[in-house]
């Protein structure tokens, strides 16, 4: 306490603790982790909470192909805070981490690892390399998660490559197929030419690309309904005008689609006539920079043009004019270029016209085939320019402009993708969409906008393409009749494949011939033959992870279906949240989760996306090295994670300062609990001073706020409540006011303060335990224990509000006392500025009060009131006087205290020298020293 050495320093009860001011988390945390591993903390915790109600947070499996990043850290720490809190709130909350282990990224890594040999290795060999790669990264990522303080069954995670998982996935597929939800058909799907596979909607990301927006005219060749003749328009000089931004699809054009509800006009340019929607004539002419044109005759309903024919612009074939409701007046010409092999709307409308073929002149790698004529061999992106140049030269292009637009890209390789009609396996969403809507309504969505978002996505989505033309994944369990080619899936074949996979894993599909897998006696339903081949596709990885409700929740004895919560980032509305919902509703008729909690993206300090190329990223390993994992955990808790969360070195530096204030509050209390035995030294409530009761009431308010925050997963509320309690209520007020009692006395007053502080620290440490898992345990290790307290703080129950609650009258009284204290501090500052006093203990304060305020202040003993103001003397005077204040009925005057300064407590007193043996001490300090 004293800056200069005094002979009485040793008689003071100065704080003493081995709990360090400098956290040293980067070094301490690994030591704690080893202790947790050595003592099997997770399984101990589960055993400790055995028999309690369960809370199941089901882990969405991260992809096992690299180091974790800040987004992964955010996700896992949110989950861990929830798990730790629930285990302290009267639940048994197991956490089984999972890993998504199949899919293209791992397959590509495996292929790159073998170099030139990739053409020579078998599918089975490739799969074995993939499995080794995935397994290695599971170990790496598990260690990184544990370094963040994440507690869970990392010794027994669920893996989508495990035989028992794959077997259950096959059964889910079979259940859906039995209900008629699985079918194979030709449809346009997202196709990545670089990865050479179909993609699901969840595997698409949008980016800005350049393209040519062009208006192209197609010459009318046949008018079977005599529409042109009826309106006096010469057929040999008449064209339909279409608009497109995908020039490479023109070789696949087989139709031009009009809307039967729209009217179309003949637009004369020179001596030629051009058909387009009447409402779009001006916008088309403006886009084509054509000023001299004339609309000839009256508008014609779109229906009159149906089944007219036209010549293809660049290939020796004719197309059909057809009608479709998807044609709009929002852009273009009202005449839509239709290539059924390269667009969903195009494909669907062509299905209504059997005479219109579905042409796909593009191969797996994105190269045009012989169906594209002279463009064969060109990749679609290069063909854009070649085709445009030829059409421009032939006069088919009416207008052209270079634009930037949002275009779909593959989320794996980040290259542009195409729509391409291929034979694929689909899940028919339309057949159970209404059931999905009902399931969505049963779920609690957090934030609540998740309900409408999910419902909108399900409403707008097409059938789910679940097949992939790759090797590393769970095979589609279908057989084909060698004689007629019909696919064959029955209960018996599903059971045979499932049993085989459960025994040997899905590699068995590649080890055995079809006849060795399919049950004896199976015959083709169409032709009666019994010779078979196997399907060569694998399932979409979203079907893998979407099956965890069956393969994990239903299979693991410590878990149950449905889960209480799924918690992931917002991108999972079209990913895991949705695939899990679809497979669960399709197979079980209900949602796999009771609630869904969603978090945002991690962005840099300016709110921009993090990219390696931009150099604006920050890695968890860097922050752990500099500050420790608890600072990352504090970052998570301090953020509103329902929106995008900012991260950067400056932010973590600021958080380390906030952390230090929380830590130092605990350290101060621990220092003042030196020698305190809560089993024998705690005093009864009636021995507490009134300010002690105020501190406990403030603690009770903290419990109310933090309990409310944890209940709705608002950890930001918990953090701010804890921070304000530590800084404002404790450090700036209560702990400051009680220093004299703690340092200078040894009696009941000191024990009352210690009792209060002990209760505060025990509760505070439990409150912060889910967030600051390392620091809370360190505090717990240094804390004096009572009988029955556990070795680990996470085994404790979260403190319940109400035990220290104060009534409104008490709260109002202390709000008034604190307001008076604030006014006194202002006057003391003025006295200090005028050199009347130095430290506040040099002051004597006179408080001029009205009757009401006098009565309130006089209810506090004067020595306690002086401690409250941190002055040597306080005098109460009824009436007016002193400096006016913001408190009604209060005036404040400050003067230098009379008497002399006590060498031990620094208070001014007239009793200095009253004890001959201690002439420099006040009477109180002399009696303490002599005791």
What is each PLM-predicted segment?
Residues 2-25, 31, 35-39, 111-251, ...:
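Residue patterns forming the tRNA-binding/recognition surfaces of aminoacyl-tRNA synthetases
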Residues 47-109, 242-251, 257, 322-349, ...:
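N-terminal catalytic cores of NTP/NDP-binding nucleotidyl/phosphoryl-transfer enzymes
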Residues 49, 53-60, 71-74, 78, ...:
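Secondary-structure capping and boundary motifs in well-ordered enzyme cores
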Residues 100, 189, 193, 199-207, ...:
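Acidic, turn-prone loop/beta-hairpin segments
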Residues 189, 407, 478, 521, ...:
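Residues immediately within or flanking Cys/His clusters that coordinate Zn2+
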Residues 192, 410, 481, 524-527, ...:
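Short cysteine-rich clusters marking metal-coordination/redox-active sites
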Residues 196, 469, 485, 528-529, ...:
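Cys/His-coordinated zinc-binding microdomains
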Residues 222, 319, 353-366, 470-472, ...:
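Alpha-helical recognition segments enriched in aromatics with Gly/Pro capping
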């Amino acid at each position: 306490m004293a800056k200069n050495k005094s002979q009485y320093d040793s008689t003071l009860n100065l704080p003493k603790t081995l709990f360090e001011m400098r956290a040293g988390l980067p070094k301490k945390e690994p030591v704690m982790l080893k202790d947790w591993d050595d003592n099997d903390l997770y399984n101990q915790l589960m055993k400790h909470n055995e028999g309690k109600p369960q809370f199941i947070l089901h882990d969405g499996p991260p992809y096992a192909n690299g180091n974790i990043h800040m987004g992964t850290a955010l996700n896992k720490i949110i989950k861990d805070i929830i798990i730790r809190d629930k285990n302290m709130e009267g639940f048994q909350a197991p956490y089984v981490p999972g890993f998504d282990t199949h899919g293209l990224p791992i397959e590509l890594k495996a292929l790159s690892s073998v170099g030139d040999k990739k053409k020579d290795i078998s599918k089975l060999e490739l799969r074995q390399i993939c499995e080794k790669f995935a397994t290695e990264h599971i170990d790496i990522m598990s260690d990184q998660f544990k370094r963040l303080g994440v507690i869970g069954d990392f010794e027994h995670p669920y893996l989508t490559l495990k035989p028992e998982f794959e077997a259950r996935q096959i059964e889910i597929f079979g259940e859906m197929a039995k209900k008629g939800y699985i079918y194979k058909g030709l449809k346009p799907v997202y196709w990545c030419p670089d990865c050479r596979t179909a993609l699901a909607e969840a595997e698409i990301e949008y980016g800005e690309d350049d393209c040519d927006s062009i208006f192209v005219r197609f010459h009318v060749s046949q008018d079977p309904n005599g529409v042109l003749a009826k309106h006096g328009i010469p057929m040999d000089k008449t064209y339909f005008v279409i608009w497109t931004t995908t020039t490479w699809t023109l070789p696949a054009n087989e139709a031009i689609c009009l809307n039967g509800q729209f009217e179309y006009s003949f637009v004369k340019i020179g001596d030629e006539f051009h058909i387009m929607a009447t409402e779009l004539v001006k916008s088309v002419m403006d886009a084509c920079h054509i000023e001299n044109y004339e609309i000839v005759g009256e508008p014609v309903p779109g229906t009159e043009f149906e089944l007219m024919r036209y010549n293809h612009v660049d290939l020796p074939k004719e197309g059909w004019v057809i009608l479709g409701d998807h044609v709009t007046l929002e852009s273009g010409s009202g005449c839509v270029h239709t290539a059924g092999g390269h667009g969903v709307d195009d494909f669907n409308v062509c299905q209504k016209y059997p005479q219109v073929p579905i042409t796909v002149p593009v191969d797996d790698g994105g190269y045009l085939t012989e169906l594209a004529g002279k463009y064969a061999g060109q990749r679609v992106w290069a063909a854009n320019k070649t085709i445009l140049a030829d059409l421009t030269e032939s006069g088919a292009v009416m207008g052209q402009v270079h634009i930037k637009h949002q275009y779909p890209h593959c989320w794996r390789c980040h290259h542009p993708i195409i729509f391409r009609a291929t034979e694929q396996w689909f899940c028919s969403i339309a057949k159970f969409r209404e059931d999905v809507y009902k399931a969505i309504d049963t779920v609690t969505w957090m934030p609540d906008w998740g309900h409408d978002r999910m419902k909108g996505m399900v409403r707008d989505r097409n059938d789910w393409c679940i097949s992939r033309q790759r090797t590393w994944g769970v095979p589609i369990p279908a057989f084909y009749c060698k004689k007629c080619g019909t696919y064959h899936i029955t209960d018996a074949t599903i059971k045979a494949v499932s049993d085989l996979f459960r025994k040997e894993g899905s590699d068995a599909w590649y080890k055995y011939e079809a006849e060795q897998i399919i049950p004896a006696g199976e015959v083709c339903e169409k032709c009666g033959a019994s010779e078979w081949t196997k399907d060569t596709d694998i399932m979409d990885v979203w079907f893998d992870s979407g099956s965890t409700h069956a393969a994990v929740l239903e299979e693991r004895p410590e878990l149950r279906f449905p889960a209480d919560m799924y918690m992931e980032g917002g991108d999972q509305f079209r990913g895991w949240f949705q695939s899990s919902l679809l497979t669960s509703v399709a197979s079980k008729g209900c949602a796999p989760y009771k609630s869904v909690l969603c978090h945002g993206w991690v962005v840099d300090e300016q709110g921009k996306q993090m990219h390696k190329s931009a150099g604006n990223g920050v890695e968890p390993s860097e922050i752990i090295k500099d500050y420790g994992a608890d600072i990352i955990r504090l970052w998570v808790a301090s953020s509103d994670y329902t929106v995008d969360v900012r991260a950067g070195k400056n932010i973590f530096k600021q958080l380390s300062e906030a952390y230090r204030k929380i830590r130092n509050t605990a350290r101060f209390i621990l220092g003042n609990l030196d020698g305190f035995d809560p089993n024998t030294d705690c005093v009864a409530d009636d021995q507490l001073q009134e300010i002690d009761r105020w501190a406990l009431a403030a603690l009770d308010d903290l419990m109310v706020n933090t309990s409310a925050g944890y209940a709705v997963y608002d950890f930001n509320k918990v953090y701010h409540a804890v921070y304000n309690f530590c800084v404002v209520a404790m450090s700036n007020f209560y702990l400051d006011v009680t220093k004299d009692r703690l340092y200078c006395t040894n009696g009941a007053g000191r024990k009352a303060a210690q009792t209060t502080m002990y209760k505060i620290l025990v509760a505070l440490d439990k409150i912060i335990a889910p967030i600051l898992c390392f620091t809370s345990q360190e505090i717990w290790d240094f804390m004096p224990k009572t009988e029955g307290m556990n070795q680990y703080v996470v085994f404790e129950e979260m403190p319940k509000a109400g035990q220290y609650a104060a009534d409104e009258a008490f709260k109002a009284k202390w709000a008034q006392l604190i307001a008076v204290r604030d006014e006194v501090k202002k006057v003391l500052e003025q006295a200090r500025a005028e050199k009347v006093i130095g430290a506040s203990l040099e002051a004597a304060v006179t408080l001029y009060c009205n009757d009401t305020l006098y009565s309130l202040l006089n209810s506090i003993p004067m020595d306690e009131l002086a401690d409250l103001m941190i002055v040597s003397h306080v005098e109460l005077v009824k009436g007016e006087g002193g400096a006016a204040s913001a408190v009604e009925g209060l005036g404040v005057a400050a003067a230098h205290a009379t008497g002399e300064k006590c060498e031990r407590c620094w208070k001014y007193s007239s009793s200095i020298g009253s004890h001959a043996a201690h002439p420099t001490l006040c009477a109180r300090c002399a009696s303490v020293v002599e005791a």
